Amino acid sequence: MATEKWVFMVTAQTPTNIAVIKYWGKRDEVRILPVNDSISVTLDPDHLCTVTTVAVSPAFDRDRMWLNGKEISLSGSRYQNCLREIRGRAGDVEDMEKGIKIRKKDWEKLNLHIASHNNFPTAAGLASSAAGFACLVFSLAKLMNVDEDPSHLSAIARQGSGSACRSLFGGFVKWTMGSKEDGSDSVAVQLADEKHWDDLVIIIAVVSSRQKETSSTSGMRESVETSLLLQHRAKEVVPKRILQMEEAIKNRDFASFTQLTCTDSNQFHAVCLDTSPPIFYMNDTSHRIISLVEKWNRSEGTPQVAYTFDAGPNAVLIARNRKVAVQLLQGLLYYFPPKSDTDMKSYVVGDNSILKEAGLDGASGVENLQPPPEIKDNIGSQDQKGEVSYFICTRPGKGPIVLHDQTQALLDPETGLPK
């Protein structure tokens, strides 16, 4: 086999997810076992995703990986754990067309090339590591003919990045903390698919696409060691919220969903403040967006928009339907207009058909926006240009898929090197 020069590869696409009941804190740092259950919404991979190509060849002399075009080291324990677990479950692979035959036992000796690309900022609080590790595990499982269901694969992805386990499903997903020491029961399960509640529209305000000062990994460790609020949250608060959130999702009860999502996001950031030294993930712009949503929800009498923030300043806003999303976007663009030379289609990305519905497909549209009547005196004037880098409009989406179109592959099919 060593003299052969074939390259066998698979390309896959995996979504990212946003937690509505947060995961913050591990009880086991090595196996990545959380101190509480969490629930997330998978975001439409058409707008936010990781694409990964994995290749195997007898010509490769070592495992190599490229992330967003730059070669990175695979020596870290998280990558090694994922690679070891997947290789240990590999099956026989045969490609009659190319005359390739890989026996189960051969996988230990063969080296891999991996290329991965996020279509959104890495490490800025948009769960890029979640999509990345989920995509790595999913694509390798397809390459190596691993016969496991997504929940079993989620336990492997979890060892790369905790929230990655939730990106192996579409729709609404629960990561069960489990109780076993080996982590075998700490897996993700789908609560409902993406079609279950398809009225929802999600707008993300990318407040900063810079890398954050405190990584989630070190932030969590410090919170577990120093925050009494985290202990109270994990034991007393989250178990009840998980049950309530499951019920809200099942019944498409937006009022309960909003109340739980917003309070859980705020408590997560309170835990960060209760950490010693305190961790600040949100900034003034984040706080202004919260004020905007809170005032609007109160003025309407029933919740129209839920907000949630992960470990970063970006706001994820979930509107109850398309009509509300149009009004929300108009309000956001009134308070956070683009700089004067910005093309609207690069300021609102993803599903930007919403711009037309909001009457904002021309640059002059923003200048003609009226302040939302119920909140115009309370948020500040329309002078916040540049506070938001851009907006992403999306919705709940599907889980991972294999991309069969070779033009989408990130590695050259002849050499197995990045294109």
Curated annotation (Swiss-Prot):
One of its GO terms (biological process) is sterol biosynthetic process. Its EC number is 4.1.1.33. (R)-5-diphosphomevalonate binds at residues 23-26, 78, 161-166, 217. A motif (Peroxisomal targeting signal PTS2) lies at residues 40-48. Performs the first committed step in the biosynthesis of isoprene-containing compounds such as sterols and terpenoids. Is specific for (R)-5-diphosphomevalonate (MVAPP). The catalytic efficiency with (R)-5-phosphomevalonate (MVAP) as substrate is 10000-fold lower than for MVAPP. NCBIfam families: mevDPdecarb. This is Diphosphomevalonate decarboxylase MVD2, peroxisomal.
